[in-house]
Amino acid sequence: MEIENHKEEVPFAHYEALFKELNPREVLERLPDVGFDGQAFQLTLLGRSFSVTYPGCEFTARDGGALPPLPTRTFLLRYLLESKRVPFGGEWKTFREMPWGEMYIKPYTGRVLTRAAFTFGTRVAAFMAAAEKMGAVPLGHGDAGYQFDLIGPYRMQIMVWEGDDEFPPNAQVLYSDNFAEGFAAEDRVVAGDILISTIKSYM
C-alpha cells in the first residue's frame, strides 16, 4: 500500500506491525476490560464497542456504525500494546499535573483546551445535548460539565464556560488519576482530541 497521508498512516502501519506480534494472553492479563474470542479483541471506547481481528488487525464497529478515524484506531492499538489496568484512586488531575505534562502542554493546549473552549463554549446547549446522548454524567461545575468513561477504568471530565463581551469561552479537562500511570503523555493528548471529536460528532 502506498502511504499518502504520512502523518496518520505511518504511525498506524507501525503499530499494526507490532499488533500482529502480540500475545493475546498477555493483553488479557494487563487489560481485563478487553475481550478475546480467539479471533478478535473486543474493546469499548466512549460507549461504542469495536472488534479488532487478530492477527489481521481489521476493525469493525459492533453497532454497525462508522469506523473511527485512523488516529483513533492507532490509539486503540497503542492501548492494546502498551496500556494496563490501573485502579482509579478517586482524584482528578489536569494534564499539566501528570508526568511529562509540562513538556507537552503547548500542543495539548491547542489541540484540547482551546479547541474544547471554542467548540463547546460557543454552543453550550448543543454540547449538553451531545453529552446527554452519549450517556455522560452531568457535573456541577462550569456553565456545563460532564464526566465520560473513555476506555476501561479511565475517565475524563470536561467543563466549559460560555464567553461574553469581556472574556472568551473557556474549558477545562480533567483526567482520572490512573491516566498518570496507564498512558504516556502523548496518548493523554490524543485521548482529549478523541473525546472532543466524538462529542462534536453528536452535536
Show which residues each predicted segment covers.
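Short, charged/polar micro-motifs that form catalytic or ligand-binding hotspots
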Residues: R62, A66, A117, A144, ...
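Short Lys/Arg-enriched alpha/beta "domain-start" segment
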Residues: M1-Q39, T72, L80-M134
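Intrinsically disordered, low-complexity regulatory segments enriched in Ser/Thr/Pro
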Residues: R48-T74, W161-E186
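Conserved binding-pocket/active-site segment within a compact domain
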Residues: T122-E181
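Ampiphathic alpha-helical segments that act as solvent-exposed interaction surfaces
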Residues: L67-G89, S176-M203
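Charge-rich alpha-helical segments
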Residues: M1-L18, G38-A40, G56-E58, G65, ...
